[in-house]
A protein has these predicted regions:
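Hydrophobic anchor at the beta1->P-loop junction of P-loop NTPases
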Residues: 3-5
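ATP-dependent small-molecule kinase phosphotransfer cores
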Residues: 29-133
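A glycine- and Lys/Arg-enriched "phosphate-lid" helix/loop adjacent to the NTP-binding pocket
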Residues: 101-183
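Walker A (P-loop) phosphate-binding loop of P-loop NTPases
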Residues: 10
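Generic alpha-helical secondary structure signal
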Residues: 19, 43-50, 143, 147, ...
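Hydrophobic positions on the alpha1 helix immediately C-terminal to the Walker A/P-loop
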Residues: 16
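Conserved lysine of the Walker
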Residues: 13
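Hydrophobic alpha-helical packing residues
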Residues: 20, 24-25
């Protein structure tokens, strides 16, 4: 079973993923976890980190199709591992997946036809061309925006922040983008 948790930055996805994994452990179900993007992954991990640090341009200046390719490539590289776990009958829990790509990249375009074209393109690229596994369950953690705002205004620390090398994540730094992403998800 492939379970995906999606949501805005700071929505509590990692907390919920850990609770789901504990539940599986208590039930004796072998489970695996991945967080996307995988900053330690060769090629795509470092490119995504550079993008999120702002080294490739401002959040509204880098073509969302190119950014979508980076995030999709990371998942395509992980697809064989996901299939291996799933084929073995294990539960797989993911913190972000394809719909994060749709949400964040489409939010960079005006609402309407251009967003819809990009949405279709990302879904076709990831599930069609790359053939990555489709989730059995995909949950969007729709928390009040004030919660996200508060979480993103706090200092965020931990090993999972190493990719920033002291910089701010350009997606997290833009509350306007986060609002638009929420609109795309909904």
């Amino acid at each position: 079973m492939l379970i995906v948790l999606e949501g805005l930055d700071g929505a509590g996805k990692s907390t919920q993923v850990e609770l789901v994994r504990r539940m599986f452990a208590q039930e004796g179900v072998e489970s695996h976890f991945l967080h996307f993007p995988r900053f330690d992954a060769p090629v795509y991990g470092e490119l995504i980190a550079r993008f999120l640090r702002g080294e490739l341009g401002a959040v509204d200046k880098v073509d969302p199709y190119l950014v979508a390719l980076l995030f999709a490539g990371d998942r395509a590289d992980a697809a064989a591992q996901l299939r291996c776990w799933l084929d073995a009958g294990h539960a797989v829990v993911l913190d972000r997946y394809v719909y994060s790509n749709v949400g964040f990249q489409c939010a960079k375009l005006p609402a309407g036809d251009r967003q819809e074209e990009l949405r279709r393109w990302i879904l076709d690229l990831e599930f069609g061309y790359y053939g990555i596994p489709r989730p059995d369950v995909s949950l969007f953690l729709d928390v009040p925006f004030a919660f996200t705002e508060k979480k993103l205004s706090e200092v965020r620390e931990g090993d999972d922040r190493d990719y920033l090398k002291g910089e701010r994540d350009i997606h997290e730094a833009s509350l306007d983008l986060q609002r638009r992403v929420r609109g795309v998800y909904r």
